[in-house]
Amino acid sequence: MPNAPLRTAIEALWERRATLSARTEGEDRDVVEKVLSALDAGTLRVAEPFADGWTVHEWLKKAVLLSFRLNDSRVMERGCGGEPAFDKVPLKFDGWDQFRFAEAGFRAVPGAIVRRSAFIAPNVVLMPSFVNVGARVDSGTMIDTWATVGSCAQIGKNCHISGGAGIGGVLEPLQAAPVIIEDDCFIGARSEVAEGVIVEKGSVLSMGVFLGASTKIVDRATGEIFMGRVPAYSVVVPGTLPPKEPGMPSLACAVIVKRVDERTRSKTSINDLLRD
């Protein structure tokens, strides 16, 4: 089924979502399953880059949400550490054997949890981490220990999502756009990127940077303030904005301490960039 009819079917299901349940069978269930399988395989994605920026496919988010209406929770015997779990969403690796993992081409360390409909590209390394429904992790990226990739988040190629970092999702609270981490980015330990923020290509976030849609991102060199996106090749650290009136509290912000171009980045390690 081409994408246009698939989209039309999902939009129609969304309008009558209250009628769906775990007892729903036939074409209604099949169309949602087709979308989830395509997301899982990476042939569809919730957000796509084009020449004029990113396009979010809302209908794919709707399909993910509809899947929760169509399934009851069940005991899952292959949870973290082999412990049983009880959930509506099966794990991506259910039933996988040596051949299936080798075919997929990525590594998943014990303790890595990926829910079905998330796409993991070849040459990804998953440390004990969590990747939620509808997310996409592209090739050459490492998701480090205790990092989380939220629902429908998009992680680019050759990124490093450091230990304990959080990449926000879109399903709860419902957000218009997923978090997007473009290619060649480094997200420092215990940082959080949420509420549809876009971290553009080649950027470096130091440890403990918190970014939401309303976070002010201040360019130290120019004074320019960005919100909702980190410009390409920025090096960002936590900071504070002074109060407008004496005696009032300062407000947290993020600070672009410098920019690097691709030539500089190719010759300079990430650690050196953060220690300037």
From Swiss-Prot:
Reaction(s) the record says it catalyses: (S)-2,3,4,5-tetrahydrodipicolinate + succinyl-CoA + H2O = (S)-2-succinylamino-6-oxoheptanedioate + CoA
Keyword terms of this UniProt record: Acyltransferase, Amino-acid biosynthesis, Cytoplasm, Diaminopimelate biosynthesis, Lysine biosynthesis, Repeat, Transferase
EC number: 2.3.1.117
Main location: cytoplasm
SUPFAM superfamilies according to UniProt: Trimeric LpxA-like enzymes
InterPro entries recorded: DapD_Trfase_Hexpep_rpt_fam, Hexapep, THP_succinylTrfase_dom1, THP_succinylTrfase_N_sf, Trimer_LpxA-like_sf
Molecular function via GO: 2,3,4,5-tetrahydropyridine-2,6-dicarboxylate N-succinyltransferase activity; nucleotidyltransferase activity
Any GO CC annotation of this UniProt entry: cytoplasm
Pathway: Amino-acid biosynthesis; L-lysine biosynthesis via DAP pathway; LL-2,6-diaminopimelate from (S)-tetrahydrodipicolinate (succinylase route): step 1/3
Any single biological process term in GO: diaminopimelate biosynthetic process
Sequence positions that bind substrate: 107, 144
Places the protein is found: Cytoplasm
Family: Belongs to the transferase hexapeptide repeat family.
Classification via PANTHER family: 2,3,4,5-TETRAHYDROPYRIDINE-2,6-DICARBOXYLATE N-SUCCINYLTRANSFERASE, MOLYBDENUM COFACTOR GUANYLYLTRANSFERASE
Quaternary structure and interacting proteins, as annotated: Homotrimer.
Record protein name field: 2,3,4,5-tetrahydropyridine-2,6-dicarboxylate N-succinyltransferase
Species in which this protein is naturally found: Gluconobacter oxydans (strain 621H) (Gluconobacter suboxydans)
Lineage: Bacteria, Pseudomonadati, Pseudomonadota, Alphaproteobacteria, Acetobacterales
